[in-house]
Design a protein with these regions (language model features):
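Conserved acidic donor-binding segment of nucleotide-sugar-dependent glycosyltransferases
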Residues: 336-344, 353-359
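N-terminal subdomain of nucleotide-sugar transferases
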Residues: 1-44, 48-56, 189
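Nucleotide-sugar-dependent
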Residues: 17, 223, 280-284, 294-315, ...
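Carbohydrate-associated surface elements
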Residues: 168, 189-190
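Nucleotide-activated donor-binding/catalytic signature segment of Leloir-type glycosyltransferases, i.e.
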Residues: 239, 249, 256-283
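Membrane-proximal helix-turn-helix segments that form the acceptor-binding/catalytic region
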Residues: 83-87, 106-109, 113-117, 129, ...
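An aromatic- and histidine-rich active-site surface loop
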Residues: 44, 79-82, 95-118, 122-131
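Conserved donor-binding/catalytic core segment of Leloir-type glycosyltransferases
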Residues: 6, 163, 206-232, 247
Length: 398
């Protein structure tokens, strides 16, 4: 089988980007020749390596841009390196199509440069960039917001077919991107159960507290860590409830600001920010947690997006609390309690409801894990990836 795919991801390296790496290794395991272009970072600094059957090409990037000139420099530099490495990959390995993973919505430009060679563009829609811009800056009338809509339209205009993470994104692909429904495949970012091992809790992590609330994820502007800290303060100030430890696992651009806010709120004795940690330490914390939290605030971006952490909590058999978001509710269903939109006090009350009811926690955790085992795990969701590419290559006579 001579089916060759080049995956381009601009914002994260592989294997750190779990979705992209699962896609790449699944395709390679099913007989495809797979290459990936990505940035250097997160401890992955080799410019080339052949890893688990995948050719990986990496490039350096400037620091994240701020302002129009900063973003132009960041994205322009990325596009140049992607084009340079795509040419190198085409000569050394070859590819029939470029599988572009956003954000940002600009990788179609690289694919256009290879169109005369018969290379098609396949879009992998990870984030809805117009809504992401709105969540960060709130300026839907601005030129930059409109440019995000234009880039998204161009992305769909130039792609042969698309993978999307959920039904909300599929609706956008059809209504905003003009795609035919049969050319849009829902490829959910299901976790691999062999990566997320259930193990015995480590009581020492709780710092002597009776309960632990866990969070896993990026510490960024739109992740809603402020709500989590407000919920922690609400519970701490209730009489007789200074028995909860909060473990916040993950790094990101807002980590230091959130640490400072935590200190100002007087929560240093019950909240720990671990930063980015090795996988085993991550598992230690999540397995020790009694309840896990997805504190992403309600906005147009988060309401339509599937959060990996929700599925990872479920895979580990953890009950969770989150704000009532469309795709969050679809993923978790009865494995979660749902707080009112952006109401930290209601989130705190929902957390207390679970901490006070061990039987309910156990039932919800088992429900969530079974949902991953039987429906939402990568073993099931990856079928859409293989179906989409089989259809594509058969249309090319391969």
């Amino acid at each position: 089988m001579d089916r060759k795919i080049l995956i381009v991801v601009e914002n994260l390296p592989v294997p750190f980007d779990t979705r992209v790496w699962q896609e790449a290794t699944t395709l390679a395991a099913n007989g495809y020749t797979v290459s990936v272009i990505c940035p250097i970072g997160k401890g992955y600094d080799k410019e080339y390596e052949f890893l688990q059957g995948v050719h990986v090409y990496r490039h350096k990037l400037p620091k994240d841009g701020n302002g129009a000139l900063g973003y132009a420099r960041e994205y322009g530099t990325a596009l140049w390196h992607e084009y340079r490495l795509a040419r190198k990959c085409y000569k050394e390995v070859g590819f029939d199509c470029i599988h572009g993973c956003n954000p940002p919505d600009d990788i179609w430009m690289i694919a256009r440069l290879f169109k005369k060679k018969g290379v098609d563009y396949i879009f992998d829609h990870h984030d809805i960039c117009p809504e992401l811009y709105e969540a960060k800056f709130g300026k839907t009338a601005s030129m930059f917001y409109k440019s995000q809509l234009w880039l998204e339209r161009q992305t769909y205009k130039h792609c042969k077919f698309a993978f999307v993470t959920n039904e909300s994104y599929k609706k956008i692909a059809i209504e905003r991107g003009g795609m035919k429904a049969e050319d849009v495949f829902v490829l959910r970012s299901g976790p691999k159960l062999e990566r997320l091992k259930i193990q015995e809790p480590k009581s020492e992590i709780k710092r002597g507290k009776k309960f632990m609330v866990g969070y896993l994820g990026v510490i960024g502007q739109q992740e809603g860590i402020e709500y989590l800290l407000k919920a922690a303060k609400y519970i701490k100030e209730l009489p007789g409830h200074n028995d909860v430890f909060w473990g916040i696992v993950g790094g990101g651009p807002d980590l230091e600001r959130m640490k400072k806010l935590c200190h100002e709120m007087g929560l240093d004795d019950i909240v720990e920010f671990t930063g980015r940690v090795p996988d085993q330490k991550l598992l230690d914390y999540l397995n020790t947690a009694d309840v896990c939290v997805n504190c992403d605030e309600y906005n147009a971006m988060n309401d339509k997006s599937t959060m990996n952490k929700v599925l990872e909590y479920m895979a580990l058999g953890k009950p969770l609390v989150q704000f009532d978001l469309t795709e969050g509710r679809y993923s978790a269903q009865d494995a979660s309690l749902y707080a009112e939109h952006n109401d930290a006090n209601d989130m705190a009350r929902k957390i207390l409801e679970l901490l006070d009811n061990p039987e309910k926690r156990k039932w919800m955790g088992e429900y969530g894990r079974n949902r991953v085992i039987n429906e939402l795990g990568w073993e099931h969701t990856s079928k859409a990836l293989l179906e989409g590419y089989d259809k594509y290559f058969r249309s090319r006579g391969k």
